Amino acid sequence: MYIEVTGYGPALVLIHGWAMHSGVFAPLVEQLRPHHTLYLVDLPGHGYNHTTPTPLALPQVVHAIAAATPPAVWLGWSLGGLFALHAAATLPQVRGLIMLAATPCFVRREDWPHAVEVSIFTQFAQDLKQNYTETINRFLALDTLGSTHAQSELRQLRKILNARHTPNTATLQAGLELLAHTDLRRAVIDLTPPSLWIAGQRDRLVPAASIQAATALAPSGQTELLTITGGGHAPFLSHANQMTAALQHFIATLP
């Protein structure tokens, strides 16, 4: 599996969200690469890995990334957070975990009220079969909904998406299945490496309350929470400076 490597310094793995590719992290990459060696992952079926045979499944993807990277901090945005969290729960080489607009359980359950209804993802899966482009555009709009810079972020996401190979319907449906049915709350409770959880105050897809609930599950004393005021689901597009400062501070405190 191809992983782009850039920069110098302590290793940081970055994993993107649904339908996107690692190019979405450009605002962070620009500021982080003078200080960190960045491992920019395109998930299977996405971007430069659009033809990789690796299935879009947590164990297989995490194993493939781990085989190609040194001990590192792992950052996952949205869907990417599930892969980063699974890695942190299963691999000793994960020095720290950064969950960016990500949660161990993306859908509402009886004992997990601060999340979206599963119908959000099942409806997107159905709509993909009818109109691929319109469905992708609606999801990107949901990514930016609520942000104080929504229109600018939406234009950025559309431009970034089309800069590399776009995933096919089967790949996107596999990602939606992960979002709809994965529950890694037990992994958070048993988490060993320190973790930083970043929420967008105005995120409509992963409400800040769900990330706050996740941090309450994590071991005390090694868990940090940052809420980006005015941020939506992609706060690194609108608040890159604040994000970069938070990431560097967290990584600098790791043993």
From Swiss-Prot:
EC number: 3.1.1.85
Keywords: Biotin biosynthesis, Cytoplasm, Hydrolase, Serine esterase
Record-level GO BP terms: biotin biosynthetic process
Binding locations of substrate: W18, S78, L79, F139, L140, A141, L142, D143, H233
Catalytic reaction equation(s): 6-carboxyhexanoyl-[ACP] methyl ester + H2O = 6-carboxyhexanoyl-[ACP] + methanol + H(+)
Keyword tRNA processing recorded: no
Main enzyme class: hydrolase
GO CC terms in record: cytoplasm; membrane
Keyword Disulfide bond: no
Its job: The physiological role of BioH is to remove the methyl group introduced by BioC when the pimeloyl moiety is complete. It allows to synthesize pimeloyl-ACP via the fatty acid synthetic pathway through the hydrolysis of the ester bonds of pimeloyl-ACP esters.
HAMAP family documented for this protein: Carboxylester (MF_01260)
Family label: Belongs to the AB hydrolase superfamily. Carboxylesterase BioH family.
Name used for this protein in its record: Pimeloyl-[acyl-carrier protein] methyl ester esterase
Species of provenance: Xylella fastidiosa (strain M12)
Lineage: Bacteria, Pseudomonadati, Pseudomonadota, Gammaproteobacteria, Lysobacterales
Gene name tied to this protein: bioH
